[in-house]
A protein has these predicted regions:
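Macromolecular interaction modules
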Residues: 2-134
């Protein structure tokens, strides 16, 4: 999804590379993220003006992540990546400006603290530039 249907403008995207809390196994982390946090995000999406939310879960059992990182001399990977899209910068910036939006943001952050190690989980705001789409 490279552009919104509104005048073909690029969507604003938050990318969040996640590391689990040390006491959680990868399986417990991913199960909680998918089955508990995912529905929680869905329930607050309208209040936060979120257009799209995608979870990408690491597949450690294949050993491919370690091989890919080792081939580049890269550090160890993440346990997953969350991606959230908004139609405009204004939508993103104003998402928590209403009482409903502030409460939704508070609830989601409180839940994240149950399974995400925020100190090792970088996030950033971006605009996509699709290069290949088939």
């Amino acid at each position: 999804m490279g552009a919104s249907c509104l005048e073909d403008r690029p969507l604003i995207k938050l990318v969040f590379c996640l590391k689990r809390l040390p006491h959680l196994s990868l399986e417990k982390f991913q199960t909680y993220w998918l089955d508990t946090h995912g529905p929680l995000v869905r329930s607050h999406a309208a209040a936060l003006k979120i257009r799209r939310y995608v979870q990408s879960h690491t597949t450690e059992n294949l050993g491919l992540n370690q091989a890919a990182a080792a081939s580049r001399g890269a550090p160890g990977g993440f346990d997953g990546v969350a991606e959230l899209w908004w139609d405009t910068v204004e939508d993103f910036a104003s998402a928590a400006s209403t009482p409903e939006g502030r409460e939704a943001a508070r609830i989601l952050l409180e839940d994240e603290r149950r399974f995400i190690d925020h100190s090792r989980s970088p996030l950033w705001i971006s605009v996509e530039h699709p290069i290949v789409e088939r």
